[in-house]
Amino acid sequence: MTAWILLPVSLSAFSITGIWTVYAMAVMNRHVCPVENWSYNDSCSPDPAEQGGPKTCCTLDDVPLISKCGTYPPESCLFSLIGNMGAFMVALICLLRYGQLLEQNRHSWINTTALITGCTNAAGLVVVGNFQVDHAKSLHYIGAGVAFPAGLLFVCLHCVLFYHGATTPLDMAMAYLRSVLAVIAFVTLVLSGVFFLHESSELQHGAALCEWVFVLDILIFYGTFSYEFGAVSSDTLVAALQPAPGRACKSSGSSSTSTHLNCAPESIAMI
């Protein structure tokens, strides 16, 4: 077991704690309304008597979407930090898992596609975290439109990869757990998108709740990689970064692909 096992857990713990902290700050600073609030008005007149605590009069501008919670300072600063650090950890996890599967001689387009979608998810998170929705709406929506579907596709691809590699009852239990998380992610992302397109306050609030469930679900999924990361080593990172031609060497009389860095001895022997 290596220290790499802490990376997926750290991503989940850091990001989940961070976004809930951002939400709490946004509520206390009266930048959004609490998630338990379902009552929205067309407009609200400022009440000087109200100081501190959550808003009691809410409009559609106060719907507690995750992005909305991180729009204004000081919570926007923490939101950007979470987005940047979370994106780095996501990319590192994707790269290590990709290399781990290569070490197991599991060379497939699914593994490569999963790496691409995971890194795309990370890139989208950087854009979402650094371009707040009220200040750079187009860029923020582009980032979200890239990050969320890419994250969902990454989850689905790794469900397939893990299921086909499961060999023990514990592996199968983890495969079923990840499948459930993938289904929840798919349903909540679709519902969030559908609800968000409507101007109804109830549907907008429903979109916010679905978005929260989707993000938390994806973060929990990333945390489950600690199951495999006990076997990760520095060689795993080398395997992930190794150029494709070096991996594509086949041993004599076999169709299996070798993951060794140097195939020259084999070539000389064949000569």
Swiss-Prot record:
Question: What domain of life is recorded for the organism?
Answer: Eukaryota
Q: Which residues cross the membrane?
A: 3-23, 76-96, 109-129, 142-162, 179-199, 212-232
Q: Does the keyword Glycoprotein apply?
A: yes
Q: State the GO CC annotations.
A: plasma membrane
Write down the InterPro entries for this protein, in alphabetical order: DRAM/TMEM150_Autophagy_Mod, Frag1/DRAM/Sfk1
Which residues are exposed on the Extracellular face of the membrane?
A: 24-75, 130-141, 200-211
Topology relative to the lipid bilayer, per the entry, is: Multi-pass membrane protein
Biological role stated in the UniProt entry: Possible role in fasting-induced catabolism. Regulates localization of phosphatidylinositol 4-kinase (PI4K) to the plasma membrane, possibly by reducing the association of TTC7 (TTC7A or TTC7B) with the PI4K complex. Acts as a regulator of phosphatidylinositol 4-phosphate (PtdIns(4)P) synthesis. May also play a role in fasting-induced catabolism.
Entry's family note: Belongs to the DRAM/TMEM150 family.
Q: What is this protein called?
A: Transmembrane protein 150A
Organism, scientific name: Rattus norvegicus
Gene (name only): Tmem150a
